[in-house]
């Protein structure tokens, strides 16, 4: 009995010696009896074990009586799926001048081993404001840095890879959704079982801004003196300086949305109040309007909006 073998190539994690781990068994398909009708070999009994060589061919030299049998893979290399198919074959009576018969199970076609494959899926969300994030692009890499694929999240913040061969990988963000900070972390995962699905939840921090508002005005700083025929004349001198005591309100000038599409502030809505000369709290990206609420003492309120 001889066979041919096909082993699916694993280009990401090659193993040229995979054939060395493969073992096949020959089993009886029915009870095998002696000339007296006594069962000598019960049905499904293992009769021989053999492997294949570097040409991916194998053969059994077991001296089997005329009967029905099947071939079954007992062991394959790590990273490949065991073929549990039973391949039937038979030895039948031949002319008396034929001493040995060679059969080829599976019609002489190669018996295949596929690589173990699994998947990785991601869910991407906004760590700052909540909500799913679309258009996050992640690369899938083997531990030696070879890119094995990529993922791009949809409007639900989701994507799933194509089949990945058994092995260790990591995810790394290539492009962050608009309005968020690129995540520099690597997220390792391992595919170890056939059709396994690894789920990874990922987040981005939204970009934010701060506003520093300073107020300048003229204050009396000195006086120039000059002699006149009527006495000393004083001319006030004014200098520009930063003024304290102003208070400002910051409004949304347009509807402001988070990167995940959540409405944070409607147009005209007050976001925060800040004192002049102080840095504002973190503000979401968007168009704002600054309006003076309280003028410094001794100055007229500035009613102009600053966009």
Residue ranges and their predicted role:
Residues 1-307:
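Solvent-exposed loop/turn and edge beta-strand elements of beta-rich ligand-binding domains
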């Amino acid at each position: 009995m001889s066979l041919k073998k096909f082993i699916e190539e694993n280009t990401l994690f090659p193993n040229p010696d995979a054939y060395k781990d493969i073992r096949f068994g020959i089993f009886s398909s029915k009870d095998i009896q002696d000339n007296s009708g006594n069962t000598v070999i019960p049905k499904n009994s293992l009769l021989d074990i053999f492997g294949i060589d570097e040409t991916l061919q194998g053969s059994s030299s077991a001296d089997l009586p005329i009967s029905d049998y099947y071939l079954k893979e007992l062991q394959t290399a790590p990273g490949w799926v065991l073929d549990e198919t039973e391949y039937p074959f038979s030895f039948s009576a031949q002319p008396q001048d034929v001493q040995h018969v060679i059969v080829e199970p599976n019609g002489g076609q190669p018996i295949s081993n596929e690589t173990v494959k699994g998947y990785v899926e991601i869910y991407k969300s906004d760590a700052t404001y909540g909500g799913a994030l679309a258009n996050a692009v992640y690369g899938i890499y083997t531990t030696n840095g070879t890119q094995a694929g990529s993922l791009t999240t949809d409007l639900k913040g989701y994507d799933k890879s194509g089949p990945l061969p058994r092995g260790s990988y990591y995810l790394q963000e290539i492009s962050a959704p608009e309005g968020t900070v690129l995540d520099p972390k690597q997220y390792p995962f391992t595919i170890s079982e056939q059709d396994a699905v690894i789920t990874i939840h990922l987040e981005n921090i939204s970009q934010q801004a701060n506003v520093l508002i300073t107020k300048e005005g003229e204050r009396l700083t000195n006086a120039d003196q000059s002699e006149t025929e009527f006495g000393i004349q004083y001319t006030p001198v004014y200098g520009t300086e930063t003024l304290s005591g102003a208070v400002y309100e910051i409004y949304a000038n347009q509807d402001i949305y988070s990167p995940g599409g959540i409405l944070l502030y409607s147009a005209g809505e007050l976001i925060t109040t800040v004192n002049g000369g102080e840095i504002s709290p973190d503000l979401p990206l968007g168009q704002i309007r600054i309006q003076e609420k309280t003028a410094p003492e001794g100055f007229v309120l500035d009613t102009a909006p600053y966009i």
